[in-house]
Amino acid sequence: MLFRSDVTDGFHPVSHHGDLPERLEKLVKIQKWHMQQFADFLKKMADTPDGQGSLLDHAVFMYGSNMSNSNQHSNYPIPNLVVGGGNGKLKQGGQHLVLPERTPIANVHLSLMQKVGLERDHFGDSTGVISEF
C-alpha cells in the first residue's frame, strides 16, 4: 500500500526497523498517515448529525496497535485510543488511563462490548473489565 509518495515500503517490513534511522523515519510517516486517516474519519462522524447529537456521539471506536515495539514484538505498554460517546454510555472528556502492567487488551475489548450492551462475561484472554470507562 502506498502511504505517501515518499514511502513505498509496506508497513510490516518497516515496522521491523532494527533501530535503523531511515526505517524509523518511514515508520513515523506511515503512522502519522494512519492517524490522519482516523482523525479525518472522526471529524466526518462528528460533523454528521444523528438524533440529538452526532454519529460520533452514538458510536465508539478503538484505535491502536497490538504491539508496543513491533521491532521487538513487545506487547506492553500498548497505546490505544477510545473515541466516541457510545450513545451516552461512555465517560467523555479526555481521560488518560494507565492500566496496570500486563493488563490484557481483551479487558478493554470486553469493557467496551459491555458498555454498548453486549452481554458477555469473557472475551479472549480477558481477566476483567475496565471500570473507568
Annotate each PLM feature.
Residues 1-133:
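Ligand-binding pockets and gating/stacking loops
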